[in-house]
């Protein structure tokens, strides 16, 4: 029987973990305390001072609009950028983050107009610069709000000196960049069909468009043949199909494809109230004739094939010919590559006033059309407010009752479709009609449908020779080929957009923004006068772009040329030009940033937005890209993969996540996503991240508690036990992985590796094995000191590696360990000694862990069957027939590795009742209860408990530890 020592409380003789680092993080409150500490200690200024002599690393911030609280997309974007900035700052670079805001444009202007409408005010009654001042104040308010929201996410940056596109200097530089385009003849005035918002009375860029389902009228229309080489075509009709009946008055041609098979068909029977009658001859693509016949309830007979050659000489009449004395123009047949057999009739209604492809094919054939005596001019059938003009006879101001409207001020469809359809029925030119639900472009701000309309605008040419044999398009495509893209698919995506895009529509008919500050004559010729430009730029620098709209601005800027017939352009610049020019007034103007930027990082929608406008602006003025790399992230969906929407009630608000869980939980979610794809977020997903966070935090907490007993002793590498060398080898591997992944912006790879390492290799393996030695060994134990040294290395390296990702938690942990330190964020990633890399040792331990896995499996079964409580109650026999595994275990205390009180290794084939695992050949375990007595201090079962009479209830090892502690006065 073991005698119990009643005089010693053994729990107080153990080196148990001691720390004030709580298990429950309380992040929402703790993060605020850390932010206050950073602010008081001037952490941002210290980061800049520390890095002032290092090489620069520049991430240029794509500016969000200053018009509301941040949403989940903003939060995702800023966290990803913050991780990049912090990771380069901690790896030897001067990485300064300068946040920016896009302040001009329709979103902000729309908000002020909404306020006016609520007050019963009319925007047109307010002086322009007074309105602009309200827009400026609105933007400044939201810059302040968003700054605090970004900082609450843990984002570190120069929030006291951000860039804004409405700053006077920025407006001056934007104007200067515009002048460079003007002076190099890249800007011209022209008329083209542009996307037009009737509700907002302005042209829109592709990036300002979103697509929603919309139900439209669809019609099939008969165009009578006017001229043909073949007599049997003279009384025939070419049938087109369109989803925009209101554009029929603007028709100038019908397009076909020489690659499609067409025939002439005769109507044999008809069951309809209007449309084709028996005996009529109609032209269709053969692949589409059946669907067309069914729609019009016809039985058709194929007469013959129509050759592509016949179409070249075919001329049609307008289906509304004679209406209100108009539409007497000849309708040409044009061979177009955009014509397909996917829907319709195989013939495409072509209205160059209302479609990009229509416009392009019309211009391509312009010389031939004029040779044929066809008027090639393009009409303006619809005005700014969506009303028909005089170019649409019978529907415009000549109509009794006034002009008909296509879309009204509320974005509702007007009577245009109905009136055009009625006119076609009256003219016996309607083949069939219907309704179609399809994806249709809407303004991203008003959410209302837009139209394509021909309107005079200012453009930047994509294909003008720039004097060196290049064009803006070719320069941009070359720059793309020299740019790194993450993911790599972004390169082809941006290149295809640049290759296919039309000229850049610069002008907007709005009030809030940088004006197109040029003077031009009636023919659109731009004044090129350096003195005039200099006066404009000086005024903008001192007063902002409001100077352009001040009374007497024309005379002020033209000076001695004011008597000449130059017209002041009052259109506003496309806001994408503003942000696209930001590289000029941010990267080029600040000493702490580089031009070109190392990286631009935004959502994948910015291939058609900021990435593109920045590229074109820079290539047009500097012949190269303003960035070396482009990274994109996807969009955040709900847990079911649906787009977040207020109407669906499935939005996740970043402020609520922070309030409930803390910013580091949100950041952890970001770090565990494939951010370059669309991600999912919701309560269950967040809870999964909370669970992962707790495991990581507990590992850090255990290390902090253990290191409370660390006296900083260093043991040479060669004197370390093999297990410690293995962990150092793993740290060397992780160091390579972490650095490479930070370079590759693969944050998920880092987080997954470090989570797996902390849970699988540390908590469940290394820490578990070494707890006995760390808690129970004598103070002089080299094994214990070696383990403390390695735990110290693990802690410092892991906390520093994770600091860019989880800045609050890692700061809290670092300050718990080093309370006199200023911040973990002032630390640098540490180099790894070459001697830590030990592949042969790692290979040996793979084999050791295979055997351990079988032992652990056997003990888990024993525990489940309640034959043992703790693994220390076991002393299993391990049978090993595999000589390679047996060799790996030589000179190794497997009982310590398997956390048993004893363990016997036997050579030979395992008995039939031994525990085995199918994936570990040649190993079997026979469970056996440990012999001896349970040590009251370590709880191990040994034969030497009671060998020391002073401590009769502990093992010899523990008795020696107690005597040593007694000598040191610790008990």
Swiss-Prot record:
Binding site for ATP: 646
CC annotations in GO: cytosol
Biological function: Catalyzes the attachment of isoleucine to tRNA(Ile). As IleRS can inadvertently accommodate and process structurally similar amino acids such as valine, to avoid such errors it has two additional distinct tRNA(Ile)-dependent editing activities. One activity is designated as 'pretransfer' editing and involves the hydrolysis of activated Val-AMP. The other activity is designated 'posttransfer' editing and involves deacylation of mischarged Val-tRNA(Ile).
SUPFAM superfamilies: Anticodon-binding domain of a subclass of class I aminoacyl-tRNA synthetases, Nucleotidylyl transferase, ValRS/IleRS/LeuRS editing domain
Similarity field: Belongs to the class-I aminoacyl-tRNA synthetase family. IleS type 1 subfamily.
Signal peptide as annotated in the record: none
EC number: 6.1.1.5
InterPro entries named among the record's database cross-references: aa-tRNA-synth_I_CS (IPR001412), aa-tRNA-synth_Ia (IPR002300), Anticodon_Ile_BEm (IPR033708), Ile-tRNA-ligase (IPR002301), Ile-tRNA-ligase_type1 (IPR023585), Ile-tRNA_ligase (IPR050081), M/V/L/I-tRNA-synth_anticd-bd (IPR013155), Rossmann-like_a/b/a_fold (IPR014729)
Protein name, per record: Isoleucine--tRNA ligase
Keyword ATP-binding attached: yes
Residue positions of motif 'HIGH' region: 64-74
HAMAP family xrefs: Ile_tRNA_synth_type1
């Amino acid at each position: 029987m073991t005698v119990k020592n009643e005089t010693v409380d053994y729990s107080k003789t153990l080196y148990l973990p001691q720390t004030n680092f709580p298990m429950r993080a309380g992040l929402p409150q703790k993060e605020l305390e850390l932010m206050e500490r950073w602010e008081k200690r001037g952490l941002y200024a210290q980061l800049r001072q520390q890095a002032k002599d290092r090489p620069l690393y520049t991430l240029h911030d794509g500016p969000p609009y200053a018009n509301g609280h941040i949403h989940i997309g903003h939060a995702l974007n800023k966290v990803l950028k913050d991780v990049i900035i912090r990771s380069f700052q901690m790896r030897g670079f001067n990485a300064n983050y300068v946040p920016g805001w896009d302040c001009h444009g329709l979103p902000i202007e729309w908000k002020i107009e909404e306020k006016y409408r609520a007050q019963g005010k009319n925007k047109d009654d307010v002086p322009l610069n007074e309105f602009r001042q309200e827009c400026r104040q609105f933007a400044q308010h939201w810059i302040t709000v968003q700054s605090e929201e970004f900082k609450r996410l843990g984002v570190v940056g120069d929030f006291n000196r951000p860039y804004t596109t409405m700053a006077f200097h920025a407006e001056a530089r934007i104007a200067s960049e515009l002048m460079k385009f003007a002076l190099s003849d890249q800007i011209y005035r022209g008329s083209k069909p542009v996307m037009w918002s009737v509700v907002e009375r302005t042209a829109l860029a592709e990036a300002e468009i979103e697509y929603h389902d919309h139900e439209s009228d669809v019609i099939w229309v008969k165009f009578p043949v006017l001229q043909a080489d073949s007599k049997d075509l003279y009384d025939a009709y070419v049938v087109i199909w369109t989803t925009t009946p209101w554009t029929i008055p603007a028709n100038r041609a019908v397009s076909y494809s020489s690659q499609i098979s067409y025939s002439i068909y005769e109507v044999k029977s008809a069951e309809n109230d209007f449309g084709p009658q028996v005996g009529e001859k109609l032209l269709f693509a053969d692949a589409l004739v059946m669907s067309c016949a069914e729609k019009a309830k016809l039985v058709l007979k194929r007469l013959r094939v129509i050759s592509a050659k016949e179409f070249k000489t075919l001329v049609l009449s307008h289906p509304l010919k004679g209406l209100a004395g108009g539409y007497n123009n000849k309708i040409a047949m044009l061979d177009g590559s955009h014509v397909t057999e996917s829907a319709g009739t195989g013939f495409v209604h072509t209205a160059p006033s209302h479609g990009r492809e229509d416009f392009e094919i019309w211009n391509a054939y312009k010389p031939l059309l004029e040779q044929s005596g066809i008027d090639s001019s393009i009409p303006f059938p619809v005005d700014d407010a969506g009303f028909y003009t005089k170019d649409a006879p019978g529907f415009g101001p000549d109509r009794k009752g006034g002009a008909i409207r296509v879309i009204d001020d509320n974005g509702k469809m007007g009577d245009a479709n109905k009136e055009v359809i009625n006119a076609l029925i009256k003219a016996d030119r309607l083949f069939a009609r219907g309704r179609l639900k399809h994806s249709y472009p809407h303004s991203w701000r008003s959410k209302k449908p837009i139209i394509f309309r021909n309107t005079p605008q200012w453009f930047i040419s994509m294909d003008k020779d720039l004097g060196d044999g290049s064009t803006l398009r070719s320069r941009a495509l070359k720059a793309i080929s020299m740019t790194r893209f993450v993911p790599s698919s972004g390169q082809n995506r941006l290149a295809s957009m640049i290759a296919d895009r039309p000229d850049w529509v610069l002008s907007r008919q709005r009030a809030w923004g940088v004006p197109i500050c040029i003077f031009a004559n009636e023919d659109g010729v731009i004044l090129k006068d350096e003195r005039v430009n200099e006066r404009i730029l000086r005024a903008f620098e001192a007063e902002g772009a409001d100077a352009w709209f001040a009374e007497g601005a024309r005379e002020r800027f033209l000076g001695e040329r004011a008597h000449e017939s130059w017209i002041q352009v009052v259109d506003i610049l496309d806001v994408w030009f503003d942000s696209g020019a930001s590289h000029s007034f941010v990267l080029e103007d600040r000493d702490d940033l580089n031009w070109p930027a190392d990286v631009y990082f935004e959502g994948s929608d910015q291939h058609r937005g900021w990435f593109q406008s920045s590229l074109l602006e820079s290539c047009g003025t500097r012949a190269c890209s303003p960035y070396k790399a482009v990274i994109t992230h996807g969009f955040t969906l709900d847990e079911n993969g649906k787009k977040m929407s207020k109407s669906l009630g499935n939005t996740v608000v970043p402020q609520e996540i922070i309030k409930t869980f803390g910013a580091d939980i949100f950041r952890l979610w970001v770090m565990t996503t494939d951010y370059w794809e669309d991600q999912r977020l919701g309560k269950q997903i967040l809870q999964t991240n909370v669970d992962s966070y707790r495991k990581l935090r507990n590992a850090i907490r255990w290390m902090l508690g253990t290191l409370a007993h660390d006296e900083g002793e260093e043991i040479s590498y060669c004197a370390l036990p093999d297990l410690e060398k293995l962990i150092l080898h793993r740290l060397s591997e992780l160091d390579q992985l972490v650095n490479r992944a930070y370079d590759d912006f693969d944050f998920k790879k880092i987080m997954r590796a470090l989570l797996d390492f902390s849970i699988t290799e540390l908590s469940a393996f290394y820490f578990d094995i070494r707890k006995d030695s760390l808690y129970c060994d004598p103070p002089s134990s080299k094994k214990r000191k070696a383990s403390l040294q390695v735990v110290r290395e693990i802690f410092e390296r892991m906390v520093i590696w994770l600091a860019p990702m989880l800045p609050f938690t890692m700061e809290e942990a670092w300050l718990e360990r080093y309370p006199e330190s200023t911040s973990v964020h002032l630390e640098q990633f540490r180099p790894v000694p070459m001697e830590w890399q030990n592949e042969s040792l790692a290979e040996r331990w793979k084999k050791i862990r295979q055997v351990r896995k079988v032992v652990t499996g056997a003990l888990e079964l024993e525990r489940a069957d309640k034959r043992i409580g703790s693994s220390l109650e076991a002393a299993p026999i391990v049978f090993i027939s595999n000589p390679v595994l047996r060799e790996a275990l030589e000179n190794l205390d497997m009982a310590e590795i398997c956390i048993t009180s004893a363990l016997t290794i036997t050579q030979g084939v395992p008995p039939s009742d031994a525990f085995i695992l199918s994936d570990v050949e040649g190993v079997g375990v026979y469970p056996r209860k440990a012999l001896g007595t349970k040590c009251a201090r370590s709880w191990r079962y040994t034969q030497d408990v009671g060998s020391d009479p002073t401590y009769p209830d502990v093992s010899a090892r523990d008795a020696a530890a107690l005597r040593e502690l007694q000598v040191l006065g610790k008990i």
